[in-house]
Amino acid sequence: MAKKITLLGSTGSIGTQSLDVIRAQGYEVFGLSANRQVDKILQQVEEFHPKYVCMTDPDAAARLDAALAGRADAPKLLTGPEGLRELAALDGPDVVLNSLVGIAGLGASLTAIESGHDLALANKESLVTGGHLVTQAVAKHGVQLLPVDSEHSAIFQCLQDKESAPSLTKILLTASGGPFFGMKTEELRTKTKADALKHPNWNMGAKITIDSATLMNKGLELIEAVWLFGLPPEKIQIVVQRQSIVHSAVQFSDNSVIAQLGVPDMRIPIQYALTYPKRVPGVVPELDFAALKVLTFDVADDETFRCLAACKKAIRKGGLGPCAANGANEEAVRLFLEDKIGFLDIGRLVEAVVDSDSFGGDYTLADVYECDRMAREFVRAHL
């Protein structure tokens, strides 16, 4: 019987690449969700015939409802944030793949876990903003949390030897360095949205591409790694690997290092999460070592790229510190993409939010949303 998948965020970059994998493996799509892209999700409905579709934007939901009217095979339409949670909770799928962007993914992740579903997680904000809540829920409900980020998938793959995993002493979290690698503050001062959106290796959405340019993406991934693998931040070293071939590595107590390599294509970690624990032939070409010639490794510059420094501060503060950093970044990136602030303002604002409070202590889901709101408000007040 074909594996059934609910895919949250099916029209985005990770969502469409996930459908490439689903198509190649002959999996069944149980449910899809999107925000506004009606035409795109209509094409997906035509091909994959899901039982349920959620449109979180009400106007888009109305347009989709009209487009599906009268069709005998039309999926049941869910709407709004409550519809997204309903979709994540529904019995039927073997795996829920959360590829939503932003803090909106946290509630859906928790709902999927609490409903007993294994969760393939591409929404990094789930762990960044609510890592304590997510890991507690995973332990309570006995489900699997399968990382989809290329770096965390690489680490996860390197730790599959259950005998060696307890001897883990260090994680080497790789970064491409983004389009501005090697540049200093003065050079970055005049960088524009168009400059920042030119990633050297990966094909990603606008928000995550900006995060790669500021190194915020790597800061968020550092926070994720703390929650996923149980090491303190000082045991996680960020290494710039410009070719994006070494996706991350782990070091053990005997100082041996195991790394995962592959072409820079998100369909590799997506497929591993969906086929785990099996490995099967996929849609990505093999790595040609002869063509590589050279692999380079450098230190990440958190003196220049202040988003990375802010994330390190945030995870050391604990509590809602990472949530505050994430909310500030989401708001600052939105303003940058609207040409309302400069490139360096993103790091300035994120660091200012992290420095503004202690953020310690346990928290609830309501606390997460309130912290996110306050961080965004802080950014708007300190332009």
Positions of the model-derived regions?
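Catalytic, metal-anchored helix/loop core of enzyme active sites in primary metabolism
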Residues: 1-383
